[in-house]
Amino acid sequence: MAVRWTWAGKSCLLLALLTLAYILVEFSVSTLYASPGAGGARELGPRRLPDLDTREEDLSQPLYIKPPADSHALGEWGRASKLQLNEGELKQQEELIERYAINIYLSDRISLHRHIEDKRMYECKAKKFHYRSLPTTSVIIAFYNEAWSTLLRTIHSVLETSPAVLLKEIILVDDLSDRIYLKAQLETYISNLERVRLIRTNKREGLVRARLIGATFATGDVLTFLDCHCECNTGWLEPLLERISRDETAIVCPVIDTIDWNTFEFYMQTGEPMIGGFDWRLTFQWHSVPKHERDRRTSRIDPIRSPTMAGGLFAVSKKYFQYLGTYDTGMEVWGGENLELSFRVWQCGGKLEIHPCSHVGHVFPKRAPYARPNFLQNTARAAEVWMDEYKEHFYNRNPPARKEAYGDLSERKLLRERLKCKSFDWYLKNVFSNLHVPEDRPGWHGAIRSMGISSECLDYNAPDNNPTGANLSLFGCHGQGGNQFFEYTSNKEIRFNSVTELCAEVPQQKDYVGMQNCPKDGLPVPVNIIWHFKEDGTIFHPHTRLCLSAYRTAEGRPSVHMKTCDALDKNQLWRFEK
């Protein structure tokens, strides 16, 4: 018996040593205390659990204190900055913009600890919190080839604005970056920062799986996900954690303030924030708060219910996130995961909110810094699992999505069944009732091809931030939906509703076709947006008594205008096709 015990003891000892070796290798960059002045910040020192006699206001202190503000420094208080550059410096700046889609040349010259003016509502500033009763959080920041200064400014911003008693850790997840400065240089830098851990993936995982890797190592009660080019404002964390402490089924987002990619000006929203929505291509959109939600809230600082979230910045109870099925790991890189999670939380008994007292700035790059080749695959997965029969509206506007190999969905569908989730019809009626649901009547939606110039289809391409700022035109038929998808409704409207609900109109005394916002459901239809799409293929506008006609400009470019109807003119014939 003694011999058996000795061998068992040896086996246990060997197993313990192997486990210890694994942990040492796995956490090659461990959490260390910061030396005084690390990264330019003043350390408060290692913090103990608060004593019972510690005052509540003292519990609000962050782990690190920002250096004193320098009103003359670039970007201080969130001001816009512009450098006077010579030809060589300007070339360097443009090269960095091309690489990162952000003005990193300027970012590198702005303090990592800059101060941001606190423009929160008075009620937010006056709000008191019971810190001892709030849950702790792990802040998870996944990154891939992020610029040095924007990544470090994000880290310092969290450390310098989050109460030390609430911030369990910052977990950085490096998704196989290949930039040299993100190797040993980053490890050395964060080894001087308290409560910051670095995890590196062994292969490119994409945002969804990289975040999940971070979540598996998190020890906080709440998971707070941030993008890697953010700046947190004063008091950003407490409202999120307090809301979750009161309702664990709430996923709560901060108000996302804009940091200009070129000047680094911090635009803080001071009024009512926008809420999330989507169009029928399953692209995220911002919307104003509807009246029924304003009426439901009793205070300006009450959380605002949102049908969807942007996805980059949110907090969720770790237990609830696991119960809800975390992320769909079948999604690649990024894109679509935000809508999938939004549909899931609402349909499965939770809620999604934006807290008006929590503000985090986000640098919106000039363009996406890397491609999203799997966006349609991701959105198709969301549509197949959560949208029921309404997924046809998505496919109609994204014909290539029907051919996407979106992978095995059996586990996600079982999850929906196990959680006893509601239908998408319920979601539209109870959560996003303001969204117009297309009719998509058979034979009356899709691309509208000209019979006179048969290679061309009606096309609408509005400028950014001005949905009605263009005219209807012709462009080569591409079969991709999008800007060539139209719907002829039972109200006799020609709707362009892939992005925004727009209706074709003929402005008074004009011969071109513009676009205006469609009337809300149930309201009268203006006469200038009523069309008769006849069986013979003509598109007649009763108010002007004219017909839509294709033609070529003097330069030979195909276009459309309104013209006297002529039954023999083939340029006035059109047909819908999928």
Swiss-Prot record:
Database matches in Pfam families: Glycos_transf_2 (PF00535), Ricin_B_lectin (PF00652)
Keywords of this entry: Disulfide bond, Glycoprotein, Glycosyltransferase, Golgi apparatus, Lectin, Manganese, Membrane, Metal-binding, Signal-anchor, Transferase, Transmembrane, Transmembrane helix
Taxonomic source organism: Mus musculus (Mouse)
Site description Interaction with glycopeptide substrate, residues in chain: 459, 478, 483
Membrane topology, as annotated: Single-pass type II membrane protein
Protein name in UniProt: Polypeptide N-acetylgalactosaminyltransferase 4
InterPro entries membership: GalNAc-T, Glyco_trans_2-like, Nucleotide-diphossugar_trans, Ricin_B-like_lectins, Ricin_B_lectin
Disulfide bonds: 124-357, 348-421, 457-477, 503-518, 547-565
Gene name for this UniProt entry: Galnt4
Binding site for Mn(2+): 227, 229, 362
Cofactor: Mn(2+)
Catalyzed chemical reaction(s): L-seryl-[protein] + UDP-N-acetyl-alpha-D-galactosamine = a 3-O-[N-acetyl-alpha-D-galactosaminyl]-L-seryl-[protein] + UDP + H(+); L-threonyl-[protein] + UDP-N-acetyl-alpha-D-galactosamine = a 3-O-[N-acetyl-alpha-D-galactosaminyl]-L-threonyl-[protein] + UDP + H(+)
